[in-house]
UniProtKB/Swiss-Prot annotation:
Quaternary state and interactors: Heterotetramer composed of ParC and ParE.
Location of this chain's protein in the cell: Cell membrane
Signal peptide: none
Positions of the record's site feature: Transition state stabilizer: 128
Protein's membrane topology: Peripheral membrane protein
Active-site positions on this chain: 129 (o-(5'-phospho-dna)-tyrosine intermediate)
GO cellular component, one term: chromosome
Protein name: DNA topoisomerase 4 subunit A
InterPro entries found in the cross-reference section: GyrA/parC_rep (IPR006691), Gyrase/topoIV_suA_C (IPR035516), Topo_IIA-like_dom_sf (IPR013760), Topo_IIA_A/C_ab (IPR013758), Topo_IIA_A_a_sf (IPR013757), Topo_IIA_dom_A (IPR002205), TopoIV_A_Gneg (IPR005742), Type_II_DNA_Topoisomerases (IPR050220)
GO aspect biological process, one term: DNA topological change
Reaction(s) catalysed by this chain's protein: ATP-dependent breakage, passage and rejoining of double-stranded DNA
Keyword Protease: no
Upper classification of the organism: Bacteria, Pseudomonadati, Pseudomonadota, Alphaproteobacteria, Hyphomicrobiales
GO molecular function, one term: ATP binding
């Protein structure tokens, strides 16, 4: 702790200079240590923070055992803050309430009577209205505390004594978990199943060198038992992989994905509704429903029609789908993605090792320290019992002497002024023996029987020999600890109502990401409009006539096409880059839209080449002005960031010029020199990124247009007058050749623009 500096006497004439940096460091260190050691972090041995330990100890002092009657929480809080914990009454009451909540504690330590809050987040009633007593769990934590099982220390005012740690016969740290934020560190431990913890502890006693994997449940060997994973008081489905959980337990850091438990209820005639019966740990039901309702109003859940809370004592949240055709799995996956119906519970096993050193511990280390503590408690209780037996044997020895000399003893007591000293001298008694004889009632003295004394003496002597043998043998001590753990395991077995596992395990379904994303977007028709200068907007509905569209001065239409708000829009630039925008993310049709460069990181020297709706099954041919090109799968050019994805490598003055869908088995290429070359598409390589290969050779100029077609159907083009021309396979013989050829002059009737469409 920091140095206590009292203000010096003498006023301004007696000022002591203090280095500010050193003084701040000293006081902050004192504060940090106080927070870590006496407030925020639990002890690995009993799993309790000081405030919880003091509450349980105070209730024990008040006699609030599981079989006793309840007492007002106001009385408990008063004793705690008055004798042990000099802090605010509300903070102590909040801690007491949490110990009693069956949705906060996997194994409640306090049995509460009255309103102790609920899973909706409502507060408990004031402590003048509620009552409490300890549960069996608290009794186990205290077991042996009156038998010198643990050390005691003075309280804050040195008027009472409090335990530094509880005996902890129950594996409370892992069974009930813990959370807290200290200075520069924090702890977060989820609750576990006591039956499984006892299995792991028993295995660790037999195999002290067991690894974390040895303590975990193995589906291939279910008979061995072990820890499956967290077991939350609110249930839920854990969808974390076993490998990930093992790594978390090995390092002491990680997390667990937990989902709500849900089922589909058939309403007949094809109708159904989804019912959520369990929600993730530490999620407030009222806030969860409020969040889903907000998303519903914001039209972020187009598959959901309504949500109702039909909960009574049990959780029952009803989700009404938009229609009978809605896929329940996709609806739930979208809710898991957007709401706390799926939560990640962190694991950070940062605890006070042996009550002194804060450190992050692995699962086997936590259990090992708890077992070491239980062994120490066993030794201390055994020594305490041994001392009590020795005292009793000494007294019984005195009783036996008194019995054999009963008449003389009575005479000494009646006639001597100092009977104690006389008996010690006459019979060779110890001070304790003489005092015990003198303290006996006359009735008891007359009823002394040698047989009863010798029977008790022999019984205690036998017990003493057993305890001495126990203290002399490490193996016997571990056997005794294992027996105690076995009794706890029976009491909280999975066959019992409290002990049965509540959280189950499942693999997260391989959901269609595209389907989930679309499920979160209201599907509406739009028309995407991009101008020559790169302004983009989305008009509501499908608009065929774009002649009435308004643009800024000097700007005009570059490309427009129909789409849906659920579509992905691919934008290809002259720099060979592809960008992806969601149809629902495009600016509205009012005004001129927004510049593309605000939405994506598009270089200033690049322009929009084309844009279209993404089709993951489609392939494209991309070509540069110089006549290089290749085939790319459309799904390979989807970009997930603002930076886009470089598809075609071009160097100025060369730039990307054409992006054409693959629709056949041959490719027709027309150059600016009005020469056409036709060759099989298989000669063009397929790649995700590159410069490509030469499609057509030119002396001057570059490529003008490309068309992919099926040779069996022939090559078709349209002139400026709208007339359609088709050349069959036989008619194309003179233009057919191999890739990178020069080609021949285009056929008669080919458009003067050098394009396949007028």
């Amino acid at each position: 702790m920091g140095q206590s500096l009292l203000p010096p006497s003498g006023g301004d004439d007696n000022i002591q200079p203090v280095d500010l940096k050193a003084a701040l460091e000293e006081r902050y260190l004192a504060y940090a240590l106080s927070t870590i050691m006496h407030r925020a972090l639990p002890d690995v041995r009993d799993g309790l923070k000081p405030v919880h330990r003091r509450i349980i100890h105070a209730m024990s002092e008040m006699g609030l055992r599981p079989n006793s009657s309840f007492k007002k929480c106001a009385r408990i809080v008063g004793d705690v803050i008055g004798k042990f914990h000099p802090h605010g009454d509300q903070s102590v009451y909040d801690a007491l309430v949490r110990l009693a909540q069956d949705f906060s504690q996997r194994y409640p330590v306090v049995d509460g009577q009255g309103n102790f809050g609920n899973i909706d987040g409502d507060n408990a009633a004031a402590y003048r209205y509620t009552e409490a007593k300890m549960t069996e769990v608290a009794a186990l934590l205290l077991e042996g505390i009156d038998q010198d099982a643990v050390d005691f220390r003075p309280t804050y005012n040195e008027e009472d004594q409090e335990p530094t740690v509880l005996p902890g016969a129950f594996p409370n740290l892992l069974a009930n978990g813990a959370s807290g934020i200290a200075v520069g560190m924090a702890t977060s431990i989820p609750p576990h199943n006591a039956h499984e913890l006892c299995d792991a502890a028993l295995h660790l006693i037999k195999h002290p060198d067991a690894t974390v994997e040895d303590l975990l449940f193995d589906p291939a060997n279910p008979q061995r038992g072990g820890i499956e994973g967290p077991d939350f008081p609110t249930g839920g489905v854990i969808v974390e992989s076993r490998a990930s959980m093992a790594e978390s337990y090995r390092t002491g850091r990680g997390g667990f994905r937990v989902r709500a438990r849900w089922a589909v209820e058939d309403l007949g005639r094809g109708g159904f509704q989804i019912v959520v019966t369990e929600i993730p740990y530490q999620v407030q039901k009222s806030r969860l429903i409020e969040k889903i309702a907000e998303l519903l109003i914001a039209r972020k859940l187009p598959l959901l029609e309504d949500i109702r809370d039909e909960s009574a004592e049990d959780v029952r949240v009803v989700l009404v789908p938009k229609s009978r055709s809605v896929d329940a799995n996709i609806l739930m996956e979208s809710l898991f993605k957007l709401t706390e119906l799926e939560s990640r519970i962190p694991l950070n096993m940062n605890v006070l090792s042996m009550g002194r050193v804060p450190r992050v511990m692995a699962l086997n280390e936590v259990l090992s320290e708890w077992l070491a503590h239980r062994r120490e408690v066993l030794q201390r209780r055994s020594r305490h019992r041994l001392a009590a037996i020795d005292r009793r044997l000494e007294i019984l020895g005195g009783y036996l002497i008194a019995y054999l000399n009963i008449d003389e003893v009575i005479r000494i007591i009646r006639e001597e002024d100092e009977p104690k000293a006389v008996m010690i001298e006459r019979f060779g008694l110890t001070d304790v023996q003489a005092e015990a004889i003198l303290n006996m009632r006359l009735r008891s003295l007359r009823k002394l029987e040698e047989f009863e004394i010798r029977t008790e003496f022999d019984s205690l002597s036998k017990e003493k020999a057993e305890i001495e043998a126990l203290l002399a043998s490490g193996d016997k001590q571990w056997q005794a600890v294992a027996w105690e753990i076995g009794e706890v395991k029976k009491k909280f077995a999975k066959a019992t109502e409290l002990g049965k596992r509540r959280s189950t395990f499942s693999d997260a379904p391989d959901a269609d990401v595209e389907a989930i994303q679309q499920a979160m977007i209201e599907k509406e028709p739009i028309t995407v409009v991009i101008s020559e200068k790169g302004w983009i907007r989305a008009l509501k509905g499908h608009i065929a006539d774009t002649s009435s569209l308004q643009f800024k001065d000097g700007d005009g239409l570059k490309v427009s096409f129909p789409a849906q708000t659920t579509d992905k829009i691919l934008i290809f630039t002259t720099g060979g880059k592809a960008y992806t925008l969601g149809g629902d993310k495009l600016p509205g049709g009012r005004g001129h839209g927004e510049p593309l460069r605000i939405m994506v990181d598009m270089e200033n020297d690049q322009d929009v080449l084309t844009a279209f709706v993404h089709d993951p099954a489609r392939k494209l041919i991309v070509s540069s002005t110089a006549g290089n090109g290749f085939v790319v799968t459309e799904s390979d050019i989807v970009a997930n960031t603002r930076k886009g994805k470089q598809v075609m490598n071009v160097t100025m003055p060369d730039e990307a010029k054409l992006v054409v869908p693959v629709k056949g088995d041959h490719l027709a290429v027309v150059g600016e020199n009005r020469k056409m070359l036709v060759f099989p598409l298989v000669q063009v390589p397929e790649m995700a990124r590159g410069k490509g290969v030469r499609l057509q050779r030119y002396k001057d100029g570059g490529v003008s247009d490309i068309r992919s077609f099926a040779i069996a159907e022939g090559l078709t083009w349209e002139d400026s007058a709208g007339r359609v021309f088709t050349k069959t396979r036989d008619e194309l013989i003179e233009w057919m050749g191999d890739r990178a050829g020069a080609g021949r002059v285009v056929p008669k009737g080919f458009p003067r623009s050098g394009k396949f469409s007028g």
